[in-house]
Design a protein with these regions (language model features):
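Conserved beta-strand in the GNAT
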Residues: 2, 8-25
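Nucleotidyltransferase catalytic core that binds NTPs
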Residues: 59, 67-72, 77-170
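Active-site beta-strand termini and strand-to-loop segments that position acidic
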Residues: 4-6, 87-88
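Conserved GNAT acetyl-CoA-binding A-motif
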Residues: 47-60
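Conserved acetyl-CoA pyrophosphate-binding loop and the N-cap/start of the following alpha-helix
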Residues: 30, 34-42, 121
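Conserved catalytic loop/helix region of short-chain dehydrogenase/reductase
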Residues: 25, 29, 143
Length: 170
């Protein structure tokens, strides 16, 4: 998304992909005009209309204050480099807390898969991994950038692992 001046020159921009906001910039000659807030508000609205309610971004440390003032909260910081932020005050911490609720004794393992589509090979991989640990955490890539939509892939995976009681789907 971009904003233009009277001469049709881009003076502010920002973009979004999946549940992230990115690439914000405001021309130095137009800073202080509220363009950042207009771009951010527009992109958050776009994301909400898409159903992306939990948003993430990373930014330079010097720019984090602008996002903080607009309702974003720090998740992590790389000193001197960047800040990772979200639009929920304790969203990431709550996610980590919920993960501890699934903690079990014994060996735990994790798999991350796209499953585009979920095949017998994927099922064999999950079964083999599950047989070698007490608890297997299975994470399915949720980005809808492939031929098979996430909702279909999720359904196929859940059906394909339903006989495995030690697999926790995330």
């Amino acid at each position: 998304c971009a904003m233009y001046d009277e001469e049709h020159q881009i003076v502010a921009t920002g973009s979004c992909f999946a549940n992230t906001l990115r690439c914000f910039a405001v021309s130095s000659s137009h800073q202080g005009e509220g363009l950042f807030n207009q771009i951010l508000t527009h992109l958050v609205d776009v994301q909400y209309r898409r159903g992306n309610l939990h948003l993430f971004l990373y930014t330079k440390i010097d720019s984090a204050k602008f996002f903080r003032d607009s309702g974003f909260y720090e998740i992590a910081k790389v000193d001197g480099s960047l800040v990772f932020m979200e639009n929920r005050k304790n969203g990431f911490q709550e996610y980590l807390t919920n993960l501890t609720k699934t903690k079990t004794d014994g060996l735990s393992a994790a798999l991350v898969m796209n499953a585009n589509p979920f095949t017998l090979g994927h099922q064999y991989l999950v079964e083999t991994a599950a047989s070698q640990c007490h608890t297997l955490h299975l994470f399915l890539v949720s980005e809808d950038v492939s031929l098979i939509p996430f909702s279909v892939r999720k359904k196929l995976v859940l059906e394909g692992i339903s006989h495995l009681p030690n697999v926790i789907f995330h």
